[in-house]
Amino acid sequence: MHTESAEPVGFPFTAIEGQPQLQMALLLAAIDPLLGGVLVEGPRGTAKSTSARALAALLPAGRFVNLPLGATEEQLVGSIDLEAALQRSAVQFRAGLLAQAHQGILYVDEVNLLADGLVDLLLDVSASGINRVERDGVSHQHDARITLIGTMNPEEGQLRPQLLDRFGLFVRLENVPSTAMRKAIVKTRMAFDADPRGFFAAHANAQAALAARVAAARGVLVAIQWPDAVHDQVAQLCQDAGVEGVRADLVMLRAARAHAALQGREQVTFVDVQAVAELALAHRRTQGAPQSQEGDEPSPESGGAQTSQPSGQRADQRADQSTDAQQAPPSPQPANAQTWGEMSAPQAVPIQTVKALRPFSSKKA
């Protein structure tokens, strides 16, 4: 558990192959740390941790702090020397991992296995940029503008929906889709392993240019505005996705603003919104809500498209069908019909003659 400085022999961010969505999400979070971090879901070997470490080299401080699963709350937020505070009336604060990660990357591998309380605390700090520590009436706070990156393998469990929604952006990685891409990734990695310094030097110009773009975007971020028409588009996308609350709207607008800043634009455009929409909606879209145009395919379970109707019409149709069913005579079923689970039609049962019963004798035995 320690802070790691970005070394020049680290794998360069600009050399990562086959993960454009992941790279974009990480850059947006680096430009605006208050987005709420990035959650990356995917199988092993899909460049999750490599990308997170490489991002740190693009930031001015270059800090990369790893949060182990066994960390305690005190190790994360820091601690207050209560005795010193009482005796000398001065707060003596011992910095935790959040303070160490200020202006850098705080990375949590297998965040789905981290205690819910720590995840909740991390997300609070990531969204506010401030770490508050309280102990027995003594409090201390400090800036903690961290770029939070959490990764998880879905085979090892899921995050609770309440925590999932609080991550600003979400990227779902798949296995390498083609043999050509596999070859490109392997060749790149082998070239780096053979000569890390030489490989990094070959990408130094691209790295410097991207770092300059990120720094410039961070500098102009707050000056970039979005027109009402863009805000209308964001609201409609979130409404169509059936998301709960307005967190998705806020994240999408902030992410679109960061994207515009990275592209050198002075205001947010529809292009910026489209570039970030799925990153903000993928983990918030409710079941049954329409996907984006590319993903509008019926699921195998649905059996095809279904047409929704107003509830009043459905109720009237059910009533009509019920009346028709009562009036229509039962139709004969073929012998080979699949009628498992159906209830047979009610049959009239004649009243049987009941033999009269002799009353009990009132005399006592």
Where are these regions (language model features)?
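Dynamic helix-loop-helix/coil hinge segments at AAA+ ATPase domain boundaries and subdomain interfaces
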Residues: 2-23, 241-242
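Walker A/P-loop
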Residues: 30-69
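Conserved Walker
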Residues: 35, 41-44, 86-97, 111, ...
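C-terminal engagement/docking regions of AAA+ P-loop ATPases
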Residues: 47, 236-239, 244, 258-365
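Short glycine-rich substrate-engagement loop in P-loop NTPases that contacts/grips substrate
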Residues: 72-101
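Conserved AAA+/SF3 P-loop NTPase catalytic/coupling segment centered on the Walker-B
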Residues: 72-73, 99-126, 159-164, 181-182
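Basic, amphipathic alpha-helical bundle interface domains used for macromolecular binding and assembly
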Residues: 119, 177-178, 183, 190-286
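A short helix-turn-beta junction within AAA+ P-loop NTPase domains corresponding to the substrate/partner-engaging
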Residues: 160-177
